[in-house]
């Protein structure tokens, strides 16, 4: 079988941080790893895995976290980080297969959070039960729990991450306010806000996990760089390395092992997993890691691929794939950028901070539920500053916005495994995704609303740019769907795999419906909810055997 060339860890030593994060961190697995049984093995160090590990460690459990990537050196920008990440087979815009699919944002310690913009929206009530407007064949889009069940976890995380900024007017009345004051709007955001208000919109500050003021032992944002292009130089952004993993790295009952890829889950009997087979990517040696519980937090593409690779005599189609739904129902969210320019005060154009700092400081949800939109529901519009990989406009102020909207779950959109092998000898990941025509109609409607907003702001030279969402995305959902019925879902309401009692999934895989907002905070809230349940279960089990 043909091998797809991927990055070798030994070729990328300049991108790796020369120092460990703390005493609990090292690259690779030491000899004798198989001799120990951990309370919990967390697979993946990104948005959800770090939250789960933090809760489990602080509940007194012995936790091993394995992460395929490495800790990045401070100078590594998004371009270089992307070049270190393994790609996947995917369809291009014409429907042809290419090897340029994106099965993650970046592959490194902290995952995509080290380059995300910090957008931290709470989902809306509609997102938990959209069935009145979202009609799909053979797919249950109702979540197995409600927004009210998740609100306490949102509140904890907003305080921990230092989320700053408000919410859409009238949303979540009655829940405690757990956010700090909003960041100052950018010059572009002020123009967009005024234009939106003239259209009858209700703009609000984009909620951001970025310190406006010092918080949690981390500095305030210095606006030194654009958050989506570079690692945060001050620690102000609430990426999971700064907020969760760095403090954990000094904890005696936590072990963080980077450069370790989870190849497959192994079973000695039906109904549970006995070990995870891991590859030390520096030495090329395989190790068997044992734990009482396994928390899978790789993202909605990589977690599905791990389960599909985990074929055993007890799970011949892959662990958790009893319903043949693992990998199916992949949702990416549709999105598009629109931009234009307006005249501005020369002092604003000369200000070096005009195009740095938070990527978004104003948002609009006036078309989230919109009877004029095809299907009756639209999505989000928000400021989205251009990252520094693209030429900035120096003789005018650029207004750049993005619209994001949920896609209809479709079982034919799926993650699969190829006959081609990757550089580690594993089946390459296949992303088979085709947008629903109904969603493309909704996207056209929303881009029209974006163009109207820009024209109202006086923008000229308006142009649009695709985000390439169909080939992969930083918003990944739905491949290990949650539900009460094991025949129609992969995991239960707590993220536990129906057919493997000691395996939990805490990333966006669990989402029955992707929601129309940036999902990171919601994924983290689910991870916190699930990890608290795991800790309670293990404590009860331990007490029963004393």
Swiss-Prot record:
The keyword Oxidoreductase applies. The keyword Transferase does not apply. Its EC number is 1.1.3.-. Keywords: Antibiotic biosynthesis, FAD, Flavoprotein, Oxidoreductase. Residues 1-30 are annotated as: Disordered. Signal peptide: none annotated. Pathway: Antibiotic biosynthesis; lividomycin biosynthesis. Its cofactor is FAD. It is an enzyme of class 1 (oxidoreductase). Gene3D superfamilies: FAD/NAD(P)-binding domain. GO terms for biological process: antibiotic biosynthetic process. Glucosaminyl-6'-oxidase involved in the biosynthetic pathway of lividomycin by mediating FAD-dependent dehydrogenation of 6'''-hydroxyparomomycin to paromomycin. One of its GO terms (molecular function) is flavin adenine dinucleotide binding. Belongs to the GMC oxidoreductase family. The active site is at 475 (proton acceptor). This is 6'''-hydroxyparomomycin C oxidase.
């Amino acid at each position: 079988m043909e091998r797809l060339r991927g990055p070798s860890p030994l070729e990328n030593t300049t991108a790796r941080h020369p120092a460990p994060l703390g005493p609990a961190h090292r690259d690779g697995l030491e000899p004798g790893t198989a001799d120990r049984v951990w309370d919990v093995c967390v697979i993946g160090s990104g948005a959800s895995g770090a939250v789960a590990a933090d809760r489990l460690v602080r509940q007194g459990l012995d936790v091993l976290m394995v992460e395929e990537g490495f800790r990045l050196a401070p100078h590594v920008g998004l371009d270089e980080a992307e070049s270190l990440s393994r790609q996947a087979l995917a369809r291009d815009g014409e429907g042809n297969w290419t090897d340029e699919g994106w099965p993650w944002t970046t592959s490194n310690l902290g995952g995509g959070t080290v380059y995300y913009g910090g957008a931290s929206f709470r989902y809306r009530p509609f997102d938990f039960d959209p069935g009145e407007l979202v009609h799909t064949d053979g797919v249950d889009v109702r979540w197995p729990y409600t927004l009210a069940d998740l609100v306490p976890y949102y509140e904890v995380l907003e305080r921990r991450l230092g989320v700053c900024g408000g919410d859409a007017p009238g949303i979540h009345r009655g829940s405690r306010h757990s956010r700090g004051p909003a960041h100052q709007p950018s010059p572009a955001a002020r123009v967009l806000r005024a234009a939106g208000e003239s259209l009858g919109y209700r703009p609000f500050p984009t909620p951001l996990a970025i310190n406006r003021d010092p918080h949690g032992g981390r500095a305030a944002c210095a606006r030194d760089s654009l958050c989506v292009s570079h690692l945060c130089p001050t620690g102000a952004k609430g990426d999971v390395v700064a907020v969760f993993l760095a403090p954990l790295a000094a904890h005696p009952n936590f072990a963080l092992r980077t450069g370790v890829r989870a190849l497959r889950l192994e079973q000695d009997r039906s109904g549970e997993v006995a070990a995870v087979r891991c590859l030390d990517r520096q030495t090329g040696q395989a190790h068997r890691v044992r734990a009482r519980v396994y928390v899978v937090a790789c993202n909605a593409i990589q977690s599905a691929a791990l389960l599909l690779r985990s074929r055993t005599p007890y799970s011949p189609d892959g662990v958790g794939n009893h319903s043949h739904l693992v990998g199916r129902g992949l949702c990416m969210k549709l999105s598009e950028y629109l931009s234009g320019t307006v005249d501005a005060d020369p002092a604003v154009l000369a200000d070096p901070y005009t195009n740095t700092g938070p990527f978004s400081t104003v948002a609009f949800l006036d078309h989230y539920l919109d009877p004029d939109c095809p299907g009756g529901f639209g999505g989000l519009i928000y400021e989205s500053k251009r990252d520094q990989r693209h030429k900035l406009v120096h003789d005018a102020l650029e207004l750049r916005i993005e619209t994001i909207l949920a896609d209809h779950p479709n079982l034919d959109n799926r993650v699969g495994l190829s006959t081609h092998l990757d550089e580690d000898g594993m089946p390459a990941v296949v992303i088979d995704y085709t947008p629903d025509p109904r969603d493309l109609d909704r996207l056209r409607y929303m881009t029209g609303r974006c163009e109207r907003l820009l024209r109202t702001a006086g923008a000229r030279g308006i142009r649009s740019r695709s985000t390439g969402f169909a080939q992969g995305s930083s918003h990944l959902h739905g491949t290990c769907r949650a539900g009460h019925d094991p025949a129609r879902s992969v995991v239960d309401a707590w993220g536990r795999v129906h057919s493997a009692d000691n395996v939990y999934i805490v990333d966006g895989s669990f989402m029955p419906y992707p929601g129309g907002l940036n999902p990171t905070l919601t994924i983290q809230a689910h991870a916190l909810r699930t990890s608290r349940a795991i800790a309670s279960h293990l404590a009860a089990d331990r007490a029963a055997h004393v």
